[in-house]
Structures are given as C-alpha cells and as structure tokens.
From Swiss-Prot:
Matching HAMAP family: Asp_tRNA_synth_type1
Descriptive protein name: Aspartate--tRNA(Asp/Asn) ligase
GN (gene name): aspS
Record-linked Gene3D superfamilies: Bira Bifunctional Protein, Domain 2 (3.30.930.10), GAD-like domain (3.30.1360.30), Nucleic acid-binding proteins (2.40.50.140)
Disulfide bond residue pairs: none
Length: 595
C-alpha cells in the first residue's frame, strides 16, 4: 500500500477523495458494530470508520486489531455527522470510511500508557527500558522535532555567516588534567590508549592556524563524570571558532544565532544586545556566576557595618579578611521548622557552621543574635534590605566566595518556597539572557597548592592584566565569557592565546605543569603556533541543554532520543556489558574488579 497523505493532512478540502493512510492504532472504539479507529502517524491523527458487517474480510481483520498495531487503510474522506466533530484535532471535521485494511504488525499490550498524562506518571526507568514506545508519546515526538528545527536553524545561521562545518576526530589523546575521560585501548599499539574527545577545543584552534578562519561543528563529546539532570556521559555541543575576532564580535555573532533559533522554533523575538555582568558583580549580588535574574532577592554586603560588631562571629570574620553578607527573603517569615532545617543543612553542606537569621514578626526582630546589634546597625540593615513585617533575613560570615555561594543557594531555595506559597511567580518562558564576563583567569587550588585555569589553559588574559601573571595571578582577568539564561549556563567561550611564548608561560610558569608534560600533551599545538597562528576566539554550548529550555523540560534526557540513566546505563540495550576474554586479549588488557 502506498501512502497518499499523512494523517494530519485531511480536511474538508479532501471530501470525497480516496486516500491511503499508514500508521499506528491509537485507540479503538466499538459503537454498535461500527468500529472507529484513531490512526496515528508522525504528523497527527485521523479517525477511521470500519464497517465489518459489510465486508467479511474486514470483519476478520478487525478482530485482530489492538492499540499500537501498525496498519494501512484505503477509504473515502467524508464529513463527520453533525455533533460528532472533534475541534481538538486539525482533522476533526472529517473521517475516512475504510474500504480495505492491511495489517502490517499486531502489537503486544504496551507496559505503560502512551499518552502524555499517563506516561508522565510512569517511572523513568520503565520509560527508558521501552524507549521506542516512550518516543511515540506526543510530547517526546515534539521534543525531537524541536531539536531538529533548532539544529537546522543553527546550521542555516552559520552557513549564512560564511562559516564552514568541519568534523574533528572523536578519538583523541588523553589530557588527564580536565574531567575524567573515556579511554579506548589500541589493539595495534599495545599498552597505548586513545581518549574519546571531551571537546574539539584543540582541533578547532589548529583549524584557525590552518587558515579556516570560520569554523563550526555540531559535535559529539564524551565525559566520564557524575550524572545529573543536566548532564550526560555523551552529549552534543555546538562548537564555534573564528579568526581575527574580538569579544564584541563573538557576542554579536552568538546573540544573532540565539535570536534566530528562538524565532524559528518558538516564534519569539528576544531583545539584543544582551546585558553584561562582571563575574565579581554576579557573585556579589546573586551568589553565583550564572544568576537567574527573573526575580530580585539580591545579596548585600555588610562587612564594613559589622567590622566592630559586638557579635564576635561577624567581627572576627571581617578581621580575618572574610565578609558578612545578608539576604532578605521577603515574606518568608512563615518558614516551617522543617523548611528552616533544610536551609540550614544546605548552608552547612557549603561549609557554613550554622545558619544565622532574623525573623520579623509582630513588629519584632526575632533571633538570638539581635541582642548584639546596635540601633544604627539595625537601621542600616532595614534601609538597605528594605526589611518589613513578614521578612526573614539570612546571614553568611565567611571568606568572600564561600559567603556568596551559601547565600546564592539560599536565594534559590527561598524563591522555590515563595513560589510554593504563591508569593512569587517565575515563568519558564521569561527569557532573560545575559553575558557574564571578566572571570578570573586563574583560581587557586588549596589542595594542590597551585593555580589552576578557571576555565581552560588556552584562555587569553585581558591585556591590561598580563603584567600580573608572574607577581599576582589572581588579579588577572581572562577574556572568557559565559552566556546565561534563567540561571543556567547555556555556553561559554573565550579569546584564545595565540602566541606560543605566552601559551608556554601559562602552562609552565603559572600552572606549574612540568616542561616534559607540556611537551607530551601540547607540544604539537605549541609547534603549530610557531607557524603564524592568527588571533582567534570562539564559543561552545550544549545543544541538549538549549533544546531542553526550548521544550520547557528540566532534564536533557527528555530531548535526547536514547539517553543514559543517572547511573550511566542504557536500559533499553542493556549496556554497559562484559566482554569476552578473547576481546580483552586482543586489546592486551585485563580487568581487575574492585574489592
């Protein structure tokens, strides 16, 4: 049988036409001997009318039909009787009276409902075990369509900007200073290993040396890391690099791409240019370097106010070089003991010894620490935090970054509690993009007693700060930038180091990587830079994460056709699996199980 139409195409304009449709049985209804089948394909649903009493062959076939069976029908398009139309369907004014039925496959009874409401109530592991059924649900089909449209929009945009798509190797060399890698043993080079590429970073920079000038790729990347709702061991990254560009060029390029994607996929016009916020400002105000600016609840610094405080915890923290910061969670004085305990546990998990707070109830400030506050201190707190009846004020006294992180997390939890009480509305489609810039180039690692690259070692320093590379690396800002949307990092990039002398200095003098290690891991790259490397920069962002936002889901597993679980398993194909002794022997490796 040859399909003449998709199920969603039939309207009153086809009345009287003979059509052939192919698809899955969505539902079956017997109404007084007349059988109605909702036939579904990837485009939509059409109602089919079967009259088995007029056709013996049809009668036998109808007896076999079960939901999710695959069939083909040929019949005439007719108008539905008055009063039986279905306005919820594009095809709701018509039905097809079948003259013939072809059964391609009879389905077993699915282990869970394949409608959105029923499927959403099912344990995710069951859905992933039967992923081929889960993907039949309307929501999941829509997610895959959104993903396709987003990827096409991205390709069209970069093609119009004269970028070329270049594939880079998935099999790379191990660079163990980053995230954990997936190692691939070499059969023909015993004892040696490839690593699955975590990012095309080095290859795309080499392409700039090669004169490509404008490169992009929708690349598969692999990282052996702990999995969360927004992480997968294999993921898709949109990777971009260009020569002879500044940060401003990258901002404009990427904003243009996002503007096109949001318009093409959602028909939403997002305003550009995006606001910009320095890293230090983001941490000070929101307690995180990827702030959700859809709601207020900003942090405030009171270190100067409390440097001579009678409350010794505050006074000693400031004297020791730390800070005292506060957050007014407006309207949350009604937090329960359980909710407060949860927030205290959060603070402790981030290094706090406890959680100091003040509730404002019945016109009083209620807290054991209030007795230490002078009237001028209370007046300053009231003025700057706009303290009112029903508020609760949280404090953090700690080194700057820790204090910011503690209150930043409590800010998000406060917003969640406010939403739960109906006191705050945060729309998922309130698209608040911004750039976070001026990150520190280096971060000091106390455990290793050395500086490490805040992002990666190829980021160029801000030219005015290069003078501090030797004397005070923590003062050096990197030419790095992150694009943030509603509290989620969409992507990040930087202007790169392109001078071999400076790159070698960063590796050896600042990061303290031994010279022989630099040569073995990055020697080819440094060599390439000696042959006329142009100034260059770029950006990369997770396609999975962006599509999840476009679809309004919190898990990227919902927008990947065949994702792994949070334990890194493919429940459908049942991987990973053991391999045979012969396979291990061929690869010159053996397994040693943990005790």
């Amino acid at each position: 049988m040859h399909r003449t139409h998709h199920c969603a195409q039939l309207t009153t304009s086809q009345l009287g036409a003979t059509v052939s449709l192919l698809g899955w049985v969505d539902t079956i209804r017997d109404q007084g001997g007349i059988i109605f089948v909702d036939l579904r394909d990837r485009k939509g649903i059409t109602q089919i009318q079967l009259e088995p009493h007029e056709n013996a062959k049809l009668a036998e076939q109808v007896k076999q039909l079960k939901p999710e069976s695959v069939i083909g029908i040929t019949g005439k398009v007719v108008r539905r009787p008055a009063g039986t139309e279905n306005p919820a369907l594009p095809t709701g004014e018509v039905e097809v009276v079948a003259s013939s039925l072809e059964i391609h496959n009879i389905s077993d009874t699915p282990p869970f409902p394949l409608d959105d409401a029923g499927g959403d109530k099912v344990n995710e592991d069951l859905r992933l075990t039967y992923r081929y059924l889960d993907l039949r649900r309307p929501k999941m089909r829509k997610n895959l369509q959104v993903r396709h449209r987003a990827a096409k929009s991205i390709r069209d945009y970069f093609d119009a900007q004269e970028f070329i798509e270049v594939e880079t190797p998935a099999l790379f060399k191990s660079t163990p200073e980053g995230a954990r890698e997936y190692l691939v043993p070499s059969r023909i080079h015993p004892g040696q290993f490839y690593a699955l590429s975590q990012s095309p970073q080095q290859f795309k920079q080499i392409l700039m040396v090669a004169g490509v000038e404008k490169y992009f790729q929708i690349a598969r990347c692999f990282r052996d890391e702990d999995l969360r709702a927004d992480r997968q061991m294999e993921f898709t990254q949109v990777d971009v690099e260009a020569s002879f560009v500044t940060r401003e060029d990258i901002y404009a390029l990427f904003e243009g791409m996002l503007k096109k994607v949001w318009k093409d996929v959602l028909d939403v016009d997002i305003p550009t240019p995006f606001p910009r916020m320095a890293f230090h400002d983001a941490m000070n105000r929101y307690g995180v370097d990827k702030p959700d600016v859809r709601f207020a609840l900003e942090l405030a610094d009171f270190s100067e106010l409390f440097k001579n405080s009678a409350f010794k915890v505050f006074q000693s923290t400031v004297a020791g070089g730390g800070v005292v910061k506060a957050l007014n969670a407006k309207g949350l004085a009604d937090l329960t003991q359980g909710e407060l305990k949860s927030m205290e546990d959060t603070a402790k998990s981030l290094g706090a010894k406890g959680l100091a707070f003040i509730k404002v109830e019945g016109g009083e400030w209620k807290s054991p620490i209030v007795k230490f506050f002078t009237e001028p201190e209370k007046a300053e707190l009231t003025k700057r935090l706009n303290i009112e009846e029903g508020d609760i004020i949280f404090f953090a006294a700690a080194p700057w970054e820790k204090a910011c992180a503690i209150l930043g997390r409590l800010r998000l939890e406060s917003a969640a509690f406010l939403q739960k009480r109906g006191k705050l509305t945060i729309r998922h489609d309130d698209w608040q993009f911004l750039w976070v810039i001026d990150f520190p180039l280096m971060t000091y690692d106390e455990a290793e007693n050395r500086y490490v690259a805040t992002h990666h070692p190829f980021t160029a320093p801000v030219p005015d700060d290069t003078q501090y590379l030797d004397s005070d690396p923590k003062k050096v800002r990197g030419q790095h930038y992150d694009v943030v949307l509603n509290g989620m990092e969409l992507g990040g990039g930087s202007i790169r180091i392109h001078q071999p002398v400076l790159q070698k200095k960063v590796f050896e003098d600042v990061l303290k990587i031994p010279q022989d290690v630099v040569e073995s891991r990055f020697g080819y790259m440094l060599k390439a830079f000696t042959y006329g490397a142009p100034p260059h920069g770029g950006i990369a962002f997770g396609l999975d994460r962006m599509v999840a936002l476009l679809c309004g889901t919190t898990s990227i597993r919902d927008v990947i056709a065949f994702p792994k679980t949070q334990k890194g398993q493919d429940l459908m194909a049942q991987s990973p699996t053991p391999v045979t002794p012969r396979q291990l022997k061929d690869l010159h490796i053996q397994t040693v199980m943990p005790e």
